[in-house]
C-alpha cells in the first residue's frame, strides 16, 4: 500500500477492502487532533476519559454524567470495538445511531487559568465507516465558553469525525498508556491514532500493530514522540499479516521497519525528509522483516 501525508480523512472503505492493496493513504505528524489539545487534562494526560472511572483519578478527564437524547441517564457505558454502548436505568442498551443526541458532561482544568471547569460533549451523528464495517465514526461536538457547539475534531481541512478507541496515549512520548478497562480516546480521523484504525489496524484486535502504525505514520523513528515528517509525504506501507499488502506495480525503496517502540531498522538514504535529526542509532534494514519489525515503510523510488 502507498500512503500519503494529507490532512483530510481517507475515503471510507468496506471491511473487505480494508485488507488488501490500496493506492494512497494519509500519514502525518499529529498523534491526535481534537479541540482538547489546548487543555491540560487533569494534569498531563491528553484526550483520555473514563466511562466508569472514579472521579478525580488524576490521569483522565472526570466524566460526571452521560445522558441519552432519548432514554434518560446512563448507568453503565462501555466500548465494543469502536462502538460506544450505554445502558440506562431500566436496563435498555443503546448503541450506534441510537446515541445521537447524547451528552457527556466532564470536568477538566483549562490551561489558560488553571480553573477546573465543566464541559459538555454531544454526539451529533453516528455512522459506520462503510456498510457492515466494525469501525464506527462519531461526529462529536464540544460546547465552547460562550455556549456554542463546536466540532471536537477540527482539522486543517475542516471538521472531521472521531473513532472511539479503548486506550489512552501519552502526548509527549506517543506511547500507549497501560491499559485501563474503561479508558477511551476520541481519535480524530485526520491524525495518527484514528488513521491507523482506518488502515485496518484495529486496536481491539491488533493492539501492537496499531501502536506500531502510530509510530510510522508520524515517522517517530526513536519512539520518543518526535515526528520526522510533514504533510503530503508519500510512503508505502506493508505488513506480513495481510492487512496492508504490496501494491503490485509500486516501485519503492525501503525506509524502515517498525514495532510499537519505533523503528527497528532505518535506511538513512531513504527517509521521508532529507537528513532528519534523529536522536537514536538504528541499524540499516536488510531482508524484509529480518529486523523483527511488524510493519515496513518505503518511499517512492526516484
Regions found by a protein language model. Give the residues of each.
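C-terminal motif of bacterial Sec signal peptides marking the signal peptidase cleavage site
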Residues: 2-3
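Repetitive, compositionally biased segments used for assembly/scaffolding
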Residues: 7-302
Amino acid at each position: 500500500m502507498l500512503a500519503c501525508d494529507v490532512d483530510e480523512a481517507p475515503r471510507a472503505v468496506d471491511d473487505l477492502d480494508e485488507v488488501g492493496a490500496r493506492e494512497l493513504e494519509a500519514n502525518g505528524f499529529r498523534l491526535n487532533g481534537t479541540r482538547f489539545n489546548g487543555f491540560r487534562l487533569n494534569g498531563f494526560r491528553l484526550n483520555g476519559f473514563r466511562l466508569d472511572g472514579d472521579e478525580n483519578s488524576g490521569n483522565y478527564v472526570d466524566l460526571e454524567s452521560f445522558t441519552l437524547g432519548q432514554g434518560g441517564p446512563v448507568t453503565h457505558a462501555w466500548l465494543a470495538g469502536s462502538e460506544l454502548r450505554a445502558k440506562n436505568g431500566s436496563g435498555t442498551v443503546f448503541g450506534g445511531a441510537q446515541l445521537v443526541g447524547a451528552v457527556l458532561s466532564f470536568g477538566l482544568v483549562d490551561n489558560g487559568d488553571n480553573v477546573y471547569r465543566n464541559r459538555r460533549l454531544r454526539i451529533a451523528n453516528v455512522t459506520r465507516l462503510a456498510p457492515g464495517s466494525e469501525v464506527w465514526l462519531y461526529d462529536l461536538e464540544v460546547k465552547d465558553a460562550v455556549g456554542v457547539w463546536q466540532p471536537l475534531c477540527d482539522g486543517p481541512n475542516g471538521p472531521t469525525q472521531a473513532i472511539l478507541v479503548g486506550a489512552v496515549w501519552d502526548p509527549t512520548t506517543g506511547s500507549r498508556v497501560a491499559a485501563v478497562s474503561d479508558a477511551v480516546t476520541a481519535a480524530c480521523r485526520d491524525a495518527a491514532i484514528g488513521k491507523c484504525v482506518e488502515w485496518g489496524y484495529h486496536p481491539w484486535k491488533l493492539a501492537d500493530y496499531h501502536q506500531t502504525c502510530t509510530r510510522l505514520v508520524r515517522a517517530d523513528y526513536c519512539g520518543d514522540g518526535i515526528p520526522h515528517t510533514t504533510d503530503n509525504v508519500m510512503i508505502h506501507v506493508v505488513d506480513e499479516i495481510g492487512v496492508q499488502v504490496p501494491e503490485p506495480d509500486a516501485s519503492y525503496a525501503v525506509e524502515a521497519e517498525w514495532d510499537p517502540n519505533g523503528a527497528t531498522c532505518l535506511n538513512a538514504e531513504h527517509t521521508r525528509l532529507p537528513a532528519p535529526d534523529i536522536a537514536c542509532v538504528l541499524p540499516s534494514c536488510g531482508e524484509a522483516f529480518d529486523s523483527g519489525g511488524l510493519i515496513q515503510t518505503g518511499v517512492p523510488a526516484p
